[in-house]
Design a protein with these regions (language model features):
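Short, charged, intrinsically disordered terminal tails
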Residues: 3-12, 75-83
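N-terminal acidic leader/helix
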Residues: 4-33
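Charged, alpha-helix-enriched surfaces in structured cytosolic catalytic cores
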Residues: 15, 19, 44, 62
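Short, surface-exposed loop/turn segments at secondary-structure junctions
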Residues: 35-43
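Amphipathic alpha-helical segments that form the core helices of the histone-fold
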Residues: 42-58
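Short, compact, well-ordered microdomains
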Residues: 56-82
Length: 83
């Protein structure tokens, strides 16, 4: 999965990276039904979500729920701006 490689290739320390990945999984569980069954659409959405998770994370982040909430807000804002 490209999104997972993107997350794992980031510069964060291992503990923070685990929190980011957990936040990503929680967020994906919440929104996955909005992207249908087409593999390309799913992959694109997961990549956007991974970027959103990385954008809101900070070194030392320790709350996957906060990563989830903030990343979903970034995604929602991006979709609103796209029209």
């Amino acid at each position: 999965m490209e999104a997972r490689r993107l997350l794992e290739g980031s510069h964060y320390e291992p503990r923070t990276l685990r929190v980011i990945c957990e936040g990503f999984e929680k967020a994906w569980d919440e929104i996955s039904s909005h992207f249908g069954a087409e593999p390309r659409s799913i992959e694109e959405a997961q990549i956007r979500l991974a970027h959103a998770c990385l954008a809101v994370a900070r070194d030392g982040s320790d709350d996957p729920e906060r990563i989830k909430i903030d990343a979903l807000q970034v995604m929602a804002l991006a979709y609103r701006e796209r029209g």
